[in-house]
């Protein structure tokens, strides 16, 4: 990437206490990064494409090592793209395919699921084995198994189930155990990058050629938007849905002593999807000690068209005018190069530590 003159800070950089002390003393080295989380967030991923390109196209390959990539929903799709033989091409292709999607008014859950399956097939293009055998990256896909009414795609029953989830979540996040089981479908060459998971029923499932596509599809299957994935190979019978329902921003007990580098859409870590409107529901500080979070700054966002990153509501906002939405999304992807360029410059000149805020 060629450097862009930075007139205002494009990035907000926040770090947990151990990461902050380490970076301020020794700087940030790619060799120190062992884990990268990827949050759920739909089209917001397009808004940080330039950051992904800088990380996976330039910075991380300069210090090759075994790294865990753990994502929910679009986070898992971003990381699957980065595991393709040409990471930069894969990341750009995901942005192109996502942008080209278009839905008419009244589109059904089945139609959106079918469109997503086609997009996934076009993205992987028969290169599943390359993802599973990537020399440096170990992919972890977050999925939930749904219980009770949430296992049904009938809109009425599913709606009742979601109402029950919302009510239980208000009473306490732990009550979501009644509704969901967490699954991490992971590259069997390396255990998932987390310590013991005691907050919800959780299990690990080996990722392989027989379940890669179903796992990716399930990880992004938002209830009431897409159908759930049935009987995921290796995970047993049942209905499997978006991993972001439980782990929206991956507030997880990360293992090891490496830096957890988190390219994110926002400077907040929100535990679950149902916590988005609950400002008091915050991430656990002890889980963030080794995290370095990179996110678009408020100044950067204010200069984007519509003053924000792309989001799922854009499909409704631009209903009947797909070219305008696509132009907006492409502009946002182009602008996001500033995020990547600023990160590369800060990492290279050793001044990243000066910009760090406490996470």
How would you label these PLM feature ranges?
Residues 1-68, 81-359:
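Patatin-like phospholipase
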Residues 73:
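Catalytic nucleophile serine of serine hydrolases
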């Amino acid at each position: 990437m060629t450097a862009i003159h930075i007139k205002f800070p494009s990035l907000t950089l926040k770090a947990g206490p151990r990461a902050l002390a380490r970076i301020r003393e020794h700087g940030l080295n790619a060799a120190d990064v062992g884990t990268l989380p990827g949050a759920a967030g739909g089209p917001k991923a397009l808004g940080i494409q330039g950051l992904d390109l800088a990380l996976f196209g330039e910075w991380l390959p300069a210090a090759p090592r075994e790294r865990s990539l753990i994502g929910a929903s679009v986070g898992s799709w971003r990381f699957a793209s980065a595991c393709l033989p040409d990471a930069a091409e894969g990341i750009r292709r995901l942005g192109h395919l996502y942008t080209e999607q278009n839905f008419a008014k009244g589109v059904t859950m089945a139609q959106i699921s079918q469109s997503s399956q086609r997009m996934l097939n076009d993205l992987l293009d028969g290169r599943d084995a390359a993802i599973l055998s990537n020399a440096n990256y170990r992919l972890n896909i977050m999925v939930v198994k749904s219980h009770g009414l949430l296992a049904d795609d009938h809109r009425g029953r599913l709606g009742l189930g979601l109402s029950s989830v919302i009510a239980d979540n208000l009473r306490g996040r732990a009550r979501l155990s009644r509704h969901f089981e967490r699954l991490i479908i992971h590259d069997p060459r390396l255990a998932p990058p987390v310590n013991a998971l005691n907050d919800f029923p959780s299990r690990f499932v080996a990722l392989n050629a027989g379940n890669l596509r179903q796992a990716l599809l399930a990880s992004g299957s938002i209830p009431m938007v897409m159908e759930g994935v049935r009987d995921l190979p290796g995970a047993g019978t049942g209905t499997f849905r978006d991993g972001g329902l439980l782990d929206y921003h991956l507030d997880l007990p990360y293992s090891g002593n490496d830096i957890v580098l988190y390219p994110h859409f926002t400077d907040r870590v929100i535990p679950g999807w149902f916590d988005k409107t609950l400002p008091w529901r915050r991430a656990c500080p002890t889980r963030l000690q080794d995290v370095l979070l990179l996110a678009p700054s408020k100044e950067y966002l204010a200069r984007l068209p519509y003053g924000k990153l792309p989001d799922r509501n854009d499909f409704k906002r631009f209903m009947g005018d797909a070219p305008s939405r696509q132009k907006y999304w492409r502009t946002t992807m182009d602008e996001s190069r500033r995020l990547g360029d600023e990160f590369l410059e800060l990492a290279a000149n050793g001044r990243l530590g000066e910009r760090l805020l406490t996470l």
